[in-house]
């Protein structure tokens, strides 16, 4: 850990293996959470996504979230048969599919950092939330606006503001 990183970032990294701001660094590429395609700095992530993220990341992400693949497809509004075919052939994901999975990975990391417990994080992500219009946080990650709303809600929780 660098000396110039805030203490909260250091505590979150120590507890969850993921930085508090949800950014996956190079050291997290081999961590139990996170996808190598989404690891590194922003330019690495962009390069990886432009060259195509393999569909075989989906089962691991679903497992980390504690949902089935079908449940993940439904929550993120991903086409079920297309995703199943991509996974079985280990094809690359489309840009919109990658974006949804990237947002999901970042929100999972942020949720783990804020709630500091994997079981609590998984439960929070799939439970309907009044603050989010009665939707589960994962169900909002199909859009950028929903992603921002979920991150804002996590920020409120982190700072003790009623969310």
Q: Which residue stretches match the model-derived regions?
A:
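Non-transmembrane "mature" sequence context
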Residues: 1-163
């Amino acid at each position: 850990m660098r000396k110039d990183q805030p203490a909260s970032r250091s505590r979150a990294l120590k507890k969850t293996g993921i930085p508090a701001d949800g950014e996956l660094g190079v050291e997290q590429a081999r961590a139990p959470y996170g996808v190598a395609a989404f690891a590194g700095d922003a330019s690495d992530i962009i390069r990886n996504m432009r060259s195509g993220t393999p569909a075989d990341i989906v089962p691991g992400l679903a497992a980390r979230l504690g949902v089935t693949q079908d449940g993940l497809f439904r929550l993120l509004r991903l086409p079920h048969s297309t995703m199943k075919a991509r996974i079985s052939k280990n094809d690359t994901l489309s840009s919109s599919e990658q974006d949804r999975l990237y947002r999901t990975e970042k929100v999972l990391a942020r949720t783990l950092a804020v709630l500091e417990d994997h079981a609590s994080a998984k439960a929070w992500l799939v439970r309907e939330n009044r603050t989010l219009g009665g939707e589960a946080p994962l169900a909002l990650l199909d859009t950028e606006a929903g992603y921002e709303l979920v991150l804002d809600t996590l920020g409120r929780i982190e700072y003790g503001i009623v969310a």
